[in-house]
From Swiss-Prot:
The organism of origin for this protein: Ralstonia nicotianae (strain ATCC BAA-1114 / GMI1000)
EC assignment: 2.7.1.30
Any one GO CC term of the record: cytosol
Activity regulation info: Inhibited by fructose 1,6-bisphosphate (FBP).
Binding site for ADP: T11, R15, T264, G307, G408, N412
Biological process terms in GO annotation: glycerol catabolic process; glycerol metabolic process; glycerol-3-phosphate metabolic process
InterPro entries, per the entry: ATPase_NBD, Carb_kinase_FGGY, Carb_kinase_FGGY_CS, FGGY_C, FGGY_N, Glycerol_kin
Family that this chain belongs to: Belongs to the FGGY kinase family.
Keywords for the protein's UniProt record, in alphabetical order: ATP-binding, Glycerol metabolism, Kinase, Nucleotide-binding, Transferase
Binding-site positions, sn-glycerol 3-phosphate: T11, R81, E82, Y133, D242
Record-given protein name: Glycerol kinase
Length: 498
């Protein structure tokens, strides 16, 4: 049993990856599933599509590896966070589609909670803000809108879960109704300080306690899968939400270690150790993966438009044919020629929180070329990430020593060099950038004794390339000041003549 199987259940596809003991990928399979948009702002998945696609990828990955379930030491699960499922305990059938994390239908419920003055209490207890993003209001909406659901919940006939819980229920044919701390901490119902479901928050949202799963550490022997699914029973040893799993897969085990995932947006997590830091900069505090008896926390922030700015260069401006071409175009000029690109197409997120901000390209001159604009677009990803990381260090009151990176845009050397220059710390790209799935595998391995400790995993983590800062701190501060000036311009109250 020299292998680990990781299930990576994402927003648009399900994946399964077989890792060997060295954390290398032996085989992988991926399957997309349909997205449903019944109304503007609504996003749903059919939970049965999620389950069938996930099971199919497990079988395909094992087949590709020419291995069976009996060759796997354990199974780890990582998942899109906050997405909410309610199902019948007797049949395992969902009573409604899964309401996805992007879905905004619960804004009215959130507005009511804010009007009741609950914002401060929610932030203190959960580390989160009242927002449709999190699971609690989605669960409330399903109970309000499905006939008889609230009565059935009171009778103990229904179960709620995030995607990890739903998959484990199916994998064990209803024997286990569980989740881990990292997923529980995204529900608005879990108190990150007591490590328990919070009775007051459940009352505020009118949620019956019988709906909720049991919460365990992320690395834990949860139980075994039913032998019929994969030909032999498999120990479920790891569960974690995708961003926390990536932090674990990057071996960011000590306070002050941070990772940034450069995808369509950017997700940054900073390990704050055994301290849940209350942010003064609009970031959220969340449970990180727990692999032993000690609780672990992280600060989290996100940039709305990261790699998406490159898609806009391709599809909106038609400046490039493929996203990968951006690096060559940006490298055709020595710098951005004074151009600053603020890609606030959907407002500005942390640490600015300005939903009305619009995008802008500032500092154009007669000598500006498409190369300068491409370079400024890439630089915008690093500027936003730097502003966010600076807010994190102010909150955590401790310095970040290096930034570990993953995600699609982390393949871009120009971006990572500029990121290191702005931050003044090394930026490190690992050999294995499938860090989300790797985190789930590591957790499962630690729970089952396949790995002895986090230290063994940390020794295994390897850098592929480290980018060291080459510009002076004065120059970096000057560049950040240019960025902040450009941001101030997009936030000016605009006069459109009405």
């Amino acid at each position: 049993m020299e292998y680990l199987l990781a299930l990576d259940q994402g927003t648009s596809s399900s994946r399964a990856i077989v890792f060997n003991r060295a954390g290398q990928i032996v085989a992988s399979a991926q399957q997309e599933f349909p997205q449903h948009f019944p109304q503007p702002g609504w996003v749903e998945h059919d939970p049965l599509d999620i389950w069938s696609s996930q099971l199919a990828t497990c079988r395909a990955a094992l087949e590709q590896a020419r291995l069976g379930a009996a060759d796997m030491a354990a199974l780890g699960i990582t998942n899109q966070r906050e997405t909410t499922v309610v199902w019948e305990r007797a049949t395992g059938r969902p009573i409604f589609n899964a309401i996805v994390w992007q879905d905004r239908r619960t804004e009215a419920i959130c507005e009511r909670l804010r009007a009741e003055g609950l914002e401060d209490e929610v932030r203190k207890r959960t580390g989160l803000v009242i927002d449709p993003y999190f699971s609690g209001t989605k669960l409330r909406w399903i109970l309000d809108h499905v006939d008889g659901a609230r009565e059935r919940a009171a009778r103990g006939e229904l179960a709620f879960g995030t995607i990890d819980s739903w998959l484990v229920w199916q994998l064990t044919r209803g024997r286990l109704h569980v989740t881990d701390v990292s997923n529980a901490s995204r529900t608005l119902l879990w108190n990150i300080h007591t490590g328990q479901w919070d009775a007051d928050l459940m009352r505020a949202l009118d949620i019956h306690p019988s709906l909720l799963p049991e919460v365990h550490p992320s690395a834990h022997r949860f139980g075994q899968t039913d032998a019929d699914w994969l030909g032999a029973p498999l120990t479920i040893g790891g569960i974690a939400g995708d961003q926390q799993s990536a932090l674990f897969g990057q071996a960011c085990f000590k306070p002050g270690m941070a990772k940034n995932t450069y995808g369509t947006g950017c997700f940054m997590l900073l390990n704050t150790g055994e301290r849940a830091v209350e942010s003064r900069n609009g970031l959220i505090s969340t449970a990180a993966c727990q692999s032993g008896s000690r609780r672990s926390y992280a600060l989290e922030g996100s940039v709305f438009v990261g790699g998406a700015v490159v898609q806009w260069l391709r599809d909106g401006l038609r400046a490039i044919q493929r996203s990968a071409d951006v690096e060559g175009l940006a490298a055709s000029v020595p710098d951005s020629g004074g151009v600053v690109f603020v890609p606030s197409f959907t407002g500005l997120g942390a640490p600015y929180w300005d939903p009305t901000a619009q995008g802008a390209i500032v500092g154009l001159s007669r000598g500006t070329t498409i190369g300068h604009i491409a370079r400024a677009a890439l630089e915008s990803i690093a500027f936003q990430s730097t502003a966010l990381l600076q807010a994190m260090t102010r909150d955590a009151v401790s310095a970040i020593t290096e930034l570990r990176v993953d995600g699609g845009a982390s393949a871009n050397n120009l971006l990572l060099q500029f990121q290191a220059d702005l931050l003044g710390i090394p930026v490190v790209r690992p050999e294995i950038i499938e860090t989300t799935a790797l985190g789930a595998a590591y957790l499962a391995g630690i729970a089952t004794g396949f790995y002895r400790s986090e230290d063994e995993v940390a020794r295994q983590w390897r850098a592929s390339r480290t980018f060291h800062p080459v510009i002076s701190r004065d120059e970096a501060q000057h560049r950040m000041a240019q960025w902040e000036m450009a941001v101030a311009q997009v936030r000016l109250p605009t006069t459109h003549g009405h």
